């Protein structure tokens, strides 16, 4: 029997009525100056739906490939859930990989979009994440859009017509979103090996 269901329904529709106010995600920062973030099932659902609508507004649809090249922040989980909600195939790439390794993965899966951040904090250093994406995309032809999470507030290049800020994309988006009906054999994500080429 080939069942049809969106995996996010097992997280949200199944749990919202009974566990809506219960904690779904606890994010602990590395930097003691930052505060932990607690998201309830209801908050996670609303943020996932808001970003799902943003993805659809950018033309992302069932079967499209989306690269997630982000630090370990709550928005990374939201990005994965939003991709699943709209039926897009996500591929998480460690945000410490080089531009060449990122480009290899983008080209291999023929991704249409990259989700990233302006930068990341690692110890006392600020890592220029978006710069790595820009360098990688010089070798990629499939990417149509890039959504950038403002994490470090450092100055970065934003290419007109391609790059958008996360907070601007979700502005005025509804907090509900119909899930894409998926077949049990449909692809959910692509996870490459940790080698330099991922093959």
What do the PLM-derived regions correspond to, one by one?
Residues 1-10, 28, 151:
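Flexible, non-catalytic linker and terminal segments flanking ANL/adenylate-forming cores
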Residues 7, 38-39, 182, 188:
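A broad, structural micro-motif
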Residues 8, 21, 25-81, 98-103, ...:
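Conserved AMP-binding/adenylate-forming core of the ANL superfamily
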Residues 13-19, 106:
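Short glycine/proline-enriched loop/turn "hinge" motifs that connect secondary-structure elements
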Residues 20-23, 146-148, 159-192, 199:
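Conserved pre-ATP/AMP-binding loop-to-beta segment of ANL
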Residues 26-28, 69, 115, 149, ...:
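Short hydrophobic segments within beta-strands
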Residues 66, 83, 187, 193-196:
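Conserved S/T- and glycine-rich ATP-binding loop of Class I adenylate-forming
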Residues 85-168:
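Structural core segment of the AMP-binding/adenylate-forming
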């Amino acid at each position: 029997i080939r069942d049809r269901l969106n995996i996010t329904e097992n997280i949200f529709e199944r749990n919202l009525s009974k566990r809506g106010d219960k904690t779904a995600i606890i994010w602990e920062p590395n930097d003691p100056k930052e505060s932990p973030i607690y998201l309830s099932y209801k908050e996670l659902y609303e943020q996932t739906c808001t970003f799902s609508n943003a993805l659809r507004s950018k033309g992302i649809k069932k079967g499209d490939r989306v690269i997630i090249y982000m630090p370990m922040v709550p928005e990374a989980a939201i990005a994965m859930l939003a991709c699943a909600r709209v039926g897009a195939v996500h591929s998480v790439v460690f945000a410490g990989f080089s531009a060449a390794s990122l480009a290899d993965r983008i080209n291999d899966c023929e991704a249409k979009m990259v989700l990233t951040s302006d930068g990341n904090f690692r110890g006392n250093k600020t890592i220029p994440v978006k710069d790595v994406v820009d360098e990688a995309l010089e070798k990629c032809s499939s990417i149509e859009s890039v959504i950038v999470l403002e994490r470090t507030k450092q100055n970065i290049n934003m290419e007109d017509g391609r790059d958008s800020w996360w907070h601007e994309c979700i502005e005025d988006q509804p907090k509900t979103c119909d899930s894409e009906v998926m077949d049990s054999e449909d692809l959910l994500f692509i996870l490459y090996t940790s080698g330099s080429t991922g093959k």
